[in-house]
Amino acid sequence: MAPAADSPTLQPAQPSDLNQYRGYDHVHWYVGNAKQAATYYVTRMGFERVAYRGLETGSKAVASHVVRNGNITFILTSPLRSVEQASRFPEDEALLKEIHAHLERHGDGVKDVAFEVDCVESVFSAAVRNGAEVVSDVRTVEDEDGQIKMATIRTYGETTHTLIERSGYRGGFMPGYRMESNVDATSKFLPKVVLERIDHCVGNQDWDEMERVCDYYEKILGFHRFWSVDDKDICTEFSALKSIVMASPNDIVKMPINEPAKGKKQSQIEEYVDFYNGAGVQHIALRTNNIIDAITNLKARGTEFIKVPETYYEDMKIRLKRQGLVLDEDFETLKSLDILIDFDENGYLLQLFTKHLMDRPTVFIEIIQRNNFSGFGAGNFRALFEAIEREQALRGTLI
């Protein structure tokens, strides 16, 4: 969690202490059925199974399936035992109870967003000096392929950040996991989805929490404010939000932080906080170099995306002509796929959002392509909000 309002003043962590962030290492989800969740990402989104731990590897209380597409890695973890049985497994008792509590409170969701760093000790010690809440101290895990150092701190809600140093490891994922090489049987019948890496990871906060959380990222991890919009920029007839993008010192890791703003009805941020029962990760943006192929193939695999109205493209065509911007991609193809467009004088952004991945309207995925554009689609926020409000109306939560 972010520090309380009456916490002592923290001194910003110094970039010299923080070394370089290398990017997102992985995103760790707690889910009710990890095997089935992994199958969703494999069949619907073109991920591949890369590692596993469970009963067959000696893990008697929890199972984890690791899937990957490009440099995007998800760990999906589920409990194998009930809370009542937890005491039978002292090594995993605390973890087992934590997973059950997380699932009861939030449903399936992101527990940890892990960053790869050059030196765990430097980043972690700087964070601790500046008031980070420690979940686990620096520890080393090893096997015949070497060792990985890691440490974990808390961020907003019950979400955590694990710092990972991989320089001493040559294995495919992490000690304690069995590597998987079997190709899913459906892959030969389905089009390939080429994704590159995680572009950003968005956290939703409750009312008036955004500034406090952003301050926490600044002072604990040395992040800076990269981009922001307020409720005057992002609003519809019914709802609004505020957003600040926090970035690592070298701008490789970006963590947008959202909060609701006053509107006539419940916004998507309020809906998220209500159903997730607190702050947490709202969506993960996955970067691709060819969004037309990616969306075409994701839709062919059955991934569901939001619908964009015809009027959006009528307006966009006028805006592009006024700007004198010519897209590399065919406009009618983008329109047929519901791909959103944003631009400035330097370049443009193409993006589209899936529908929620779970029955609870909480987490979803963004597919994004950047063409010399470092923004976050502010020009599309209204269209996105209106699309989500149509879904909210169907759920009866636009109240």
Curated annotation (Swiss-Prot):
Cofactor: Fe cation
Catalytic reactions on record: 3-(4-hydroxyphenyl)pyruvate + O2 = homogentisate + CO2
Residues bound to Fe cation: 200, 283, 366
Keyword field contains Repeat: yes
A GO BP annotation: L-phenylalanine catabolic process
InterPro entries named in the record: 4OHPhenylPyrv_dOase, 4OHPhenylPyrv_dOase_C, 4OHPhenylPyrv_dOase_N, Glyas_Bleomycin-R_OHBP_Dase, Glyas_Fos-R_dOase_dom, VOC
UniProt KW keywords: Dioxygenase, Iron, Metal-binding, Oxidoreductase, Phenylalanine catabolism, Repeat, Tyrosine catabolism
EC number: 1.13.11.27
Annotated pathway: Amino-acid degradation; L-phenylalanine degradation; acetoacetate and fumarate from L-phenylalanine: step 3/6
Cofactor note (record): Binds 1 Fe cation per subunit.
Pfam families: Glyoxalase
CDD domains in UniProt: HPPD_C_like, HPPD_N_like
Segments forming domain VOC: 23-166, 197-355
Entry-linked PANTHER family: 4-HYDROXYPHENYLPYRUVATE DIOXYGENASE
Family: Belongs to the 4HPPD family.
Protein name as annotated: 4-hydroxyphenylpyruvate dioxygenase
Taxonomic source organism: Coccidioides immitis (strain RS)
Gene responsible for this protein: TCRP
